[in-house]
């Protein structure tokens, strides 16, 4: 829902896009999926036996995605401090994975306090794309495991190559998220 997620002061900022120059709000509408696109994802994944889920960026999107009955939800790092959104995803009764990029330990603790530990997964992340190895801070996985010993702790990797992801698993990450793109211009 771009009109809810894009700050108003950014709506009319112009930018170059694969479709030419346009305002940021128009660009967001171009790249957002609607019912038809999500229905196609759902159909394809069901045919292939793939479980899929989404990161919702606002509360109406949680309600929208619920019609596809995802097995879980994922909160993007930028949403960690949006406790109302986290609660909306948690209220579905499905597991919720939260990413921690750009967050302080206090912000992580506040989010966990707001939604509770039940059906929660926490992913250590950095929010640099691509992330240099010197900024990965994989030791945070151990810190999170000590802080939340009964909670699955994972790793969300945004770096080139797979070695850091393998290292994250070796030091205890029990799930991973990887970002993949077919077109860097989008």
Show where each model-derived region lies.
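Catalytic cores and adjacent flexible loops of soluble metabolic enzymes
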Residues: 1-186
């Amino acid at each position: 829902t771009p009109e809810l997620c894009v700050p108003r002061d950014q709506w009319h900022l112009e930018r170059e896009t694969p479709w030419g120059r346009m305002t940021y709000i128009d660009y967001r509408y171009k790249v957002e999926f609607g019912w038809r696109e999500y229905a196609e994802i759902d159909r394809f994944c069901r045919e292939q036996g793939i479980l899929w889920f989404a990161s919702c960026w606002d509360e109406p999107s949680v309600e929208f995605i619920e019609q596809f009955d995802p097995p879980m939800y994922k909160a993007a790092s930028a949403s960690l401090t949006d406790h109302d959104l986290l609660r909306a995803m948690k209220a579905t009764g499905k597991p919720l994975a939260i990413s921690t990029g750009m967050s302080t330990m206090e912000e992580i603790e506040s989010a966990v306090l707001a939604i509770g530990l039940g059906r929660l997964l926490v992913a250590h992340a950095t929010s640099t794309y691509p992330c240099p190895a010197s900024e990965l801070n994989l030791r945070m996985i151990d810190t999170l495991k000590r802080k939340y010993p009964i909670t699955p702790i994972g790793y969300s990797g945004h770096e080139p190559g797979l070695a850091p992801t393998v290292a994250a698993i070796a030091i205890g990450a029990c799930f991973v998220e990887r970002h993949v793109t077919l077109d860097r211009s989008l």
